[in-house]
C-alpha cells in the first residue's frame, strides 16, 4: 500500500477588491444619466410637468457625470449651459439658449497648452424647459403678467458662474475650438465647475449651488418667455458634490 499523503490545507480565497471612489462616481454618473435620458423620452409624451421632472433628472445626471470626469481624470471639469442670447444668425442656434448643456474637462496637451475638451455629447432639455439664469432674470424673459422672485438666496434662480467669449475643443486632437458643435464659434455660458477631488470650486460662498428649471414659451429666433413663476424645479449641489432635488418654486 502506498502511504497516504498528508492533505493540503485549502488555499485561502483572494480578498475581493472593493470599488474605488472614482469607480463608484463613474458608475453612479452613468446610471443617473441613463435614467435622465429615459425620463427625457417619457417627458416628450406627457405634460410640461412631466417634461420638467424629466429635465430635472437629466441635469442631475449631467452633474454626476461632470463630477465623475473630474475625479476620474484628476482635473477640472464643468457642466456648461448655452447662454448666448438670441437672435442668432441661425434659428437652430437660438433654440439652444438656456436649453443645451454639455460636460467638458480641462486637459494639458503634449505641447503644454491647457484646453477645455468635450467629455461627451451636448444634451438638450425636453421642450419647453429652460434653465433659469442667475438673478436678476431679465424682464424680457418673462411672459406678460409674470413676475419672478430674484432673491439669489431664496428665489428660484440659478447661482452659476458666467463667462463670455468661451469656446472649447470637441476632441483633444481637434485643430480648432467650437461652441456647442458650431466650429470656430464662441459664446456666453453659465457653468458649474468641479475640482480634481470632486468638490465644487465655482462657488466659494459655502452655500449650495442652485440650478433652477422652468417652463417657457418657445418659438422662432427669439428669447424664451417663462410662463409661470410657480412651475419650477431644480437642484441643490453641495460643495462635496452631493445633489438634492428641489420640487417647488418655494423650495429654493
Regions found by a protein language model. Name each.
Residues 2-7, 16-68, 72, 76, ...:
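N-terminal helix-rich module
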Amino acid at each position: 500500500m502506498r502511504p497516504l499523503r498528508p492533505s493540503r490545507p485549502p488555499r485561502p480565497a483572494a480578498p475581493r477588491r472593493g470599488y474605488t471612489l472614482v469607480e463608484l462616481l463613474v458608475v453612479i454618473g452613468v446610471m443617473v444619466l441613463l435614467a435622465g435620458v429615459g425620463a427625457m423620452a417619457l417627458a416628450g409624451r406627457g405634460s410640461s410637468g412631466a417634461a420638467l421632472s424629466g429635465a430635472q433628472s437629466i441635469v442631475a445626471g449631467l452633474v454626476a457625470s461632470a463630477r465623475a470626469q473630474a475625479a476620474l481624470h484628476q482635473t477640472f471639469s464643468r457642466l456648461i449651459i448655452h447662454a448666448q442670447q438670441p437672435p442668432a444668425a441661425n434659428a437652430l442656434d437660438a433654440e439652444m439658449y438656456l436649453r443645451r448643456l454639455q460636460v467638458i474637462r480641462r486637459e494639458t496637451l503634449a505641447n503644454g497648452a491647457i484646453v477645455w475638451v468635450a467629455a461627451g455629447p451636448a444634451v438638450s432639455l425636453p421642450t419647453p424647459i429652460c434653465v433659469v439664469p442667475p438673478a436678476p432674470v431679465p424682464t424680457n424673459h418673462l411672459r406678460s403678467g409674470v413676475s419672478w422672485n430674484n432673491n439669489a438666496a431664496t428665489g428660484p434662480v440659478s447661482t452659476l458662474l458666467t463667462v463670455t467669449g468661451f469656446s472649447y475643443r470637441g476632441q483633444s486632437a481637434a485643430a480648432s475650438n467650437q461652441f456647442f458643435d458650431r466650429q470656430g464659434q464662441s459664446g456666453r455660458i453659465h457653468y458649474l465647475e468641479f475640482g480634481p477631488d470632486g468638490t465644487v470650486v465655482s462657488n466659494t460662498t459655502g452655500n449650495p449651488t442652485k440650478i433652477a428649471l422652468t417652463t417657457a414659451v418657445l418659438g422662432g429666433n427669439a428669447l424664451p418667455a417663462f410662463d409661470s413663476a410657480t412651475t419650477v424645479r431644480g437642484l441643490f449641489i453641495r460643495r462635496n458634490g452631493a445633489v438634492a432635488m428641489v420640487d417647488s418654486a418655494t423650495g429654493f
